[in-house]
Amino acid sequence: MHVTNGTHELLVPFVRREITEGLWDATSAYGYGGPLTSTSAPPDFADAAFRAAVQMLREAGCVACFLRLHPLLNAHWKSSLGLVLKQGLTVSVDLTKPPEKLWQETQSRHKLGINRARRAGVMVRLDKNFETLSRFIDIYNQTMTRRCATDYYFFDKQYYRSLVDDLGDDLLLMVAEEADKVIGGALFTLARRSGIMQYHLSGSDWDYRHRQPTKIIIHTAREWGRMNGFSRLHLGGGLGSAADSLHEFKRGFSPDTHVFATQRVVINPEAYRALSEGRSTSTDDLSGYFPAYRQPIPVRVPAGSRLAV
């Protein structure tokens, strides 16, 4: 969605999801796809432009809009529409700091893992031609399965191919290898204008867990980013924005945290209430499952009944 007043611009990227004939809703793609405004836009432009965008969405048949705000780019985003809800914290590495300072801020357990991997001969390289992409996909899927991740964190092969084709040089695949075998890998996206490297997906081979390859990959990535002029390596947060072990793992590389928030806007209240019939919902309280009509209705099994397997 693009809105302009002739001088400044607002861009709201989203994925369109069909509901019924003529009705649909909007959601951010995987990751942090919040709205963007022109660099020189005054503070009041964003809210006015977003109001105009919401009106355009309503006229186009949109029922609701769910946006994942970028913890860095949308840190000062203010909107009077819907609800902006804090979901958790994310972690980033300040790449403008000298390497000695970055190493000093690295937790001792991570330093130990990185040094052990080095002594064992683990090497990290940038796979510029994505020759190891298939191996990375397998490792990533195995990692998500071990973590009991939901379907949201799994992607088909076309998704990866689209990343490679569409992002080109703005996508990095770094792999950790021991004796020429890929034991871990990570994908990073690059936003050169904003100076942000985004840690996108990563995985490691369970048989080589003692090498802790993800640690040396992130360490190498932040050095690459620093040497190539990037200002931040955004590592993200835990699964589902939780303060879990994944979040703590990322905190081991940097003390810098940022608020991750979502924005929920009901575009068409009448259609929203009609679609949400049978579910506990209110257009005044949007802090629960949103949009409410997409929440699965639990199946109630009468006492003493048996489910067929």
PLM region spans:
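A conserved beta-strand-loop-helix scaffold within acyl/acetyltransferase catalytic domains
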Residues: 1-22, 69-210, 223
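Aromatic (often tryptophan-rich) hydrophobic motifs at membrane interfaces
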Residues: 2, 14, 38, 42, ...
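Active-site/acyl-donor-binding loops of N-acyltransferases
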Residues: 15-18, 79-101, 228-309
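A gly/proline- and charged-residue-enriched helix-loop-helix capping module
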Residues: 27-74
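Mobile, glycine- and charge-enriched loop segments
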Residues: 31, 188, 195-197, 290-294
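Short catalytic-loop micro-motif centered on adjacent basic/acidic residues
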Residues: 66, 125, 232-236
